[in-house]
Curated annotation (Swiss-Prot):
Protein's name according to its UniProt entry: Histidine-binding periplasmic protein
PANTHER family attached to this UniProt entry: HISTIDINE-BINDING PERIPLASMIC PROTEIN, MEMBRANE-BOUND LYTIC MUREIN TRANSGLYCOSYLASE F
Binding, L-histidine: 91-92, 94, 99, 143, 183
Entry superkingdom: Bacteria
Signal peptide as annotated in the record: 1-22
Gene symbol of the encoding locus: hisJ
Disulfide bond positions: 60-67
Family per record: Belongs to the bacterial solute-binding protein 3 family.
Length: 260
């Protein structure tokens, strides 16, 4: 009887482990908008590169699955995830209350503050008084767009939405908008530290609103994909513990991108 109970226990344990493994797809289709350097963009060979891309590849390796990247505009990523056209989102996606009503997230991958970028000779600050009558560029589907439309647009500030962060910077340098509003790190590394951004600066301090901007960024998943989320969280915790996360981050940043 003891042998029978032991054998049955082993079978149940194996079946449970097998079921959990089977719940993780052999190939994960990861949606991304490759216009947001240094997190996701394309190099001169047309290859996807960036911190998010490196993180996703490492996470997929650790959970023993293949990852395929699917390019989409940011505002199409959540609808694509819910429609099962993709299995995950890795695109500097802030973890916000509103988004958590629609999808699930992994644990925080890194911090995300939002700031204005303006010309060096500009005195624009992120206040209603300073921005009134100005045109502010934002990326469609971002928390910055939501904040601008809720807090600034009703006060006489024109919020101009774009598909593709590069289009925002192009209009900023051409003088068609007065400021660009985006993630602080993306603006610093992807624009201000590049030759094209030499005549620009941050306009004032970061804009704080935990309800809209969330508590950091994560990988977006469907709510029902609990096993996948747990596996990714475990793999990410291991990356943080063994130094892999820090090694990848140092390729792109000279500061603690994870934050407090």
């Amino acid at each position: 009887m003891k042998k029978l109970v032991l054998s049955l226990s082993l079978v149940l344990a194996f079946s449970s482990a097998t079921a959990a493994f089977a719940a993780i797809p052999q190939n994960i289709r990861i949606g991304t908008d490759p216009t947001y350097a240094p997190f996701e963009s394309k190099n001169s060979q047309g290859e996807l590169v960036g911190f998010d891309i490196d993180l996703a590849k490492e996470l997929c390796k650790r959970i023993n699955t293949q990852c395929t990247f699917v390019e989409n505009p940011l505002d199409a990523l959540i609808p694509s995830l819910k429609a099962k056209k993709i299995d995950a989102i890795m695109s500097s996606l802030s973890i916000t209350e509103k988004r958590q009503q629609e999808i699930a997230f992994t644990d925080k991958l890194y911090a995300a503050d939002s700031r204005l970028v303006v010309a060096k000779n500009s005195d624009i600050q992120p206040t209603v008084e300073s921005l009134k009558g100005k045109r502010v560029g934002v990326l469609q589907g971002t928390t910055q767009e939501t904040f601008g439309n809720e807090h600034w647009a009703p006060k006489g500030i024109e919020i101009v939405s774009y598909q593709g962060q590069d289009n925002i910077y192009s209009d900023l340098t051409a003088g068609r908008i007065d400021a660009a509003f985006q993630d602080e790190v993306a603006a610093s590394e992807g624009f201000l530290k590049q030759p094209v951004g030499k005549d620009y600066k941050f306009g004032g301090p970061s804009v704080k609103d935990e309800k809209l901007f969330g508590v950091g960024t994560g990988m977006g998943l469907r709510k029902e994909d609990n096993e996948l989320r747990e596996a990714l969280n475990k793999a990410f915790a291991e990356m943080r513990a063994d130094g892999t996360y820090e090694k990848l981050a140092k390729k792109y940043f000279d500061f603690d991108v994870y934050g407090g």
